[in-house]
Structure formats: structure tokens, C-alpha cells
Amino acid sequence: MSTAAPILLTPGPLTTSARTRQAMMVDWGSWDDRFNQLTASLCEQLLAILNGADSHHCVPLQGSGTFAVEAAIGTLVPRDGKVLVLINGAYGKRLAKICEVLGRSFSTFETAEDEPTTAADVDRLLCADSDITHVALIHCETSTGILNPLPEIAQVVEQHGKRLIIDAMSSFGALPVDAQKVPFDALIAASGKCLEGVPGMGFVFARKESLAAAAGNSHSLAMDLFDQHSYMKKTGQWRFTPPTHVVAALHEALLQYNEEGGLPARHARYAANCQALMEEMGKLGLRSFLPAAIQAPIIATFHAPKDPRYQFKDFYERVKAKGYILYPGKLTQVETFRVGCIGHVTPAQMREAVAAVSEVLREMEVLDI
């Protein structure tokens, strides 16, 4: 079994459609009115996905999703603020590292990698520390695929009069979040995840009042979202050279997103991908790290086979030779590997990928799963 181009079963970058790739074949002038209109249309469509046009601004930013996360924390958390960082995986730890590097006061609450943070945990922590001004949460922790209970946590944060910053990198566009029902100061996502664009830009949905009050907070010129938004509102342009081809690709990806049926349809396809993956991997005896109740249909983590003949690098290269790119594990306690359910892929392709995994395990003579 082989494919002409590898299928990326990863959480981003991921497999994109031919239409999305073709959109990058046109060169754009960064100051041209047509490109400014493209940016404005993009922000309008992104805001519509979370029903945020009345309450939030969409501020795009060049770079990886982590650039946008750092920009959001640096812009929206005052220099005398304090962040409660909720951690149950590598990307929660990255939030804490960002706060440390930025010089923002922070505390952490860490649960096991297979244990969601609960609203009760957050309530207790906020009651115990009145200095906390902001709470930072990973919606879907990409190191495992675990889904944290965002709506419940958001309500507790609001009840305490605090501000919520959501890293929705691996969930935005596939898992529903309504800005009029889930209170947040910032929700951060990126082009190369569930929207099926290419990597190269992030965007922050910032509460209008909070962004308006954020002048002078940022540690950085390039990552100042207040300045980025102000300049874009005044001129229609990005402050610094924009990733023009990435913007064009994301605009085209959003056209396809809406043609597919928007968030409900995207979620349904990813859920079907995840179900097909779990069913077929289960037939091979490969065990999911997470119980189904807390597994998001974004990326799945599997226990590595116990057989000493299994070595991930060899396994990875053999599966890649059959046309599929997997992802290494990112857990601290047990050996795992990960398979993404997102991107321009179908349940049938997920089954074909598992068939390739089965062939590889036989070739490696891995018997003890």
C-alpha cells in the first residue's frame, strides 16, 4: 500500500486539499487593496465561527500558534497581573514557560496526563489566591488528545471576576465554542490545524474591552496585539510583512470549510475519522491512552507495543514508506505514539492507514502488543 504523497496523520501541519495548495500559487502585494480585503474577509469569517463579532476582535499574527499564545499573554495580562496555568500535558507546561520568560507572575495546577482539570479545581484555587487575575487553559491538550471542560471552567472563572485565556490551537473550527456563552478574554488558534490551512499564522480573538485597555502591556514590539489591531483598523494593513501565501491559503481553506457545512460537518468528519481509527487499532490490540469520555476527535495517543522488537523510529520509517506520517508520543511516564484525526482525510483513509500499521507490525515481527 502506497500513496503518491504522504498523508499526514499529525495534529498540524496536516494534509491539505489541492485547492488550498493551489491558492498559494498567486503572489500578493502586502499593501495592495485586494490583499487588505482578503485579510478583512478572513477575520470576519473567523469571528463568525465562534459567534464573536459583537464582543471580540480577531487579531492575526505572523508565525506559529505559539507566537500568538505568547502575544496574547504578553498583551492582555498586565505586568502586575498573575496567571493561574492549568496543566495536564506538554502544551500547558509551555504556557507556564511563556509566563516565566515574560516575567509575569504565575502559579500552576497540574493533573495527570489522562486527567482533565475540573471546574471544582479552578474554583478552589481561585478562592485560595486572590492575587490571580487570569486563568490560562489548553482546550484540547495535543500531547494526548484530552479534552478539558472549557464551558464549566469558563463559568467559574467569570464568577470569580477573573479573565480566561484559552489555547484552542487544536480545537478551534472543529469543537464548538460560542463567544456569547463561553466568557473569555482571549482564544488563540492557528491556520494549520482544524481549518486545514497551512502553517504560518496565528490569530487571537480578544475581548474588545480588554484589548482596548492593553496599551503598553506588551513586552514586545512585534507581538503587541494592541498595536497590531490598532494599525490594522486604521490602515487595513499588517504592521510588518504578512505571510501573504498563508493568508491566501487559509482564505481558500475557509471557503471549503463552509462548503463542507462549517463546524458541525468538520466535527462530524473528524469524529468519524477518530472512530474508524479507534475501531481498527483496537482490532490490532493497540490500546488508547485515554478513555473515550475525555478523548477529543483531534489526535489519539496509543500505548506502544511491549515487544522489544518495536522501536518507534523503525516503525515510523516503515509506516512512512507506505505513505503515512505518524507522530511520536509526548508523554513523560509511558511510551506512546500519536495519530492525528484532522486534516483533509476521510474515515476510509484512516482505515487504510491502520492497515499499513498492521502490515508494518507484521514485518517487524512485533507480537506482544
UniProtKB/Swiss-Prot annotation:
The modification N6-(pyridoxal phosphate)lysine is found at residue 193. It comes from the Bacteria. Transmembrane segments: none annotated. GO terms for biological process: organic phosphonate catabolic process. It is an enzyme of class 2 (transferase). Pfam families: Aminotran_5. InterPro entries: Aminotrans_V_dom, NH2EtPonate_pyrv_transaminase, PyrdxlP-dep_Trfase, PyrdxlP-dep_Trfase_major, PyrdxlP-dep_Trfase_small, SP_NH2Trfase/AEP_transaminase. Its EC number is 2.6.1.37. One of its GO terms (molecular function) is 2-aminoethylphosphonate-pyruvate transaminase activity. Its cofactor is pyridoxal 5'-phosphate. It catalyses: (2-aminoethyl)phosphonate + pyruvate = phosphonoacetaldehyde + L-alanine. Keywords: Aminotransferase, Pyridoxal phosphate, Pyruvate, Transferase. HAMAP family: PhnW_aminotrans_5. Belongs to the class-V pyridoxal-phosphate-dependent aminotransferase family. PhnW subfamily. PANTHER family: 2-AMINOETHYLPHOSPHONATE--PYRUVATE TRANSAMINASE. Involved in phosphonate degradation. Homodimer. This is 2-aminoethylphosphonate--pyruvate transaminase. It comes from Pseudomonas fluorescens (strain Pf0-1). The lineage of its organism: Bacteria, Pseudomonadati, Pseudomonadota, Gammaproteobacteria, Pseudomonadales.
